[in-house]
Amino acid sequence: MKRKLLFLILTLIMVFTASAKDFNLSYNAEANVICGGGDYTPFWFMNNTGGVVSDKNNSGYLRLGLFKSVAEDKKFSYSFGLDVVGAYRNEAPIYLQQAYFDAKLKNWSIFAGAREEKSMMWDQELSSGGMLISNNARPIPQIYIGLPKFTLVPFTKGWLYVRGGVSYGWFVDDCYQKEFKAEGMQYGENLLYHRKNIIFKIGHQAKPLYGIIGIDMATQFGGTVYDYLGNKTVKFPSGVKEYLKVFVPLAGGEDSPNIDQVNVSGNHLGIYILALGYKKADWDIKAYYEHFFDDHSGMTFRNKFDGLWGLSFRKTDKFFVEGVTFEVMNATNQSGPFLWDESPEIPVQVSAGDNYYAHFVYNGWVHRGHSIGTPFITSPLYNKDGYLGFTNNITRAFYGGVDGTIIDGLRYKLLVSHQRGWGTSYAPYTNIKHQFSTMLQLSYTHEKVKGWNFSLAGAFDKGNLIGDNWALQFGISKSGELLNLSKK
């Protein structure tokens, strides 16, 4: 199915390119080297990079992408991208990072492929990453239909906008799990992905004050889980009915494992989105909250105020301080310490011990070793014993980011975070672990060498959660227009 999707994307690119009246093609080439010490690449070098930067220190990569952008002023338009990475000391020496085709009709989009996803709502340069989806893991191939941008709702006189969509996809980490699991650890293959969201924006374009409210949900379902000997232990159904059951969601049928019959089919998680903002011509400030839930107890706020709290400011003009973001990620309540599903022997339901991102059968909300959501719920790739699941999800982090222009052509970005970790409800740490991480990046461009970007960055970690790490990062990139054809 994954190869068929790639073939479909390449076919669509060739067909639409050959018949296009107007066609533009841009490129981006990048080289990046990291040198340092410690067991891992510093936290803010590796995380939120789409899985491109290796977790191993003293690593690097070469990257080449070809992209066509959408024409926003046309009723029908399309975009596509092909992005290849060659890596040193990463989990694969060469791989396709992005391959997608996106057709736009008015405000609607039909998308197929794998494309890096950053936070839908918050500052994409400075946010630490959403609780549900961030740019922390490698992209998941999927097919999507929806409204990717806020669109005016008819008959609301310019006061109500909506965005949202539905997608189904495939996890592509079967080989990764088999290679990196330790003996005695279970793994899964052919897992499926589902996501749906709807978000409303309340506020008139002519007024500065606005509010945002919505829900974003995702599901891991289907596939097969194997024990350490490679024996099939759980086979999840993945027929048409299962696609409908994860959309609603509903409990699994008789052919589903007992856990899916007692609860709902698949591993469900999501966020409620709330924000209040104030926007002027050249700046925007907003306060926001993502309430995270991993089951129905979280949906009814039994996990209190777990989630991501943030305050961000963004200025559009060049200035020494153009963007500032402060965030607090809290995942310490989890509805209480333990879970008990009602049974004939003990007819009591205790909906607690939410065990964020984890699952009773699946390894959890992880793709190729990286947490799909916030990096503060420690990614399984940090597990030195080959365990593919989460070992630290009871955690709290304080985070800050700032960026701006020092002089023409010279920009900076500073990220700082401090995190405490308690382990999990089922395997708590003996002592609370701490981690401080920071990064400072300088990037330089000059009008005489158009399209070139040179960057230098330093970062370090201090603590006992992922250890003491430090490194310098050197980067160079070149982007520009490759083709611009106007056919008559």
Q: What name fits each language-model region?
A:
Residues A18, K74-L105, E117-N136:
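Surface-exposed loop and membrane-interface regions of Gram-negative outer-membrane beta-barrel proteins
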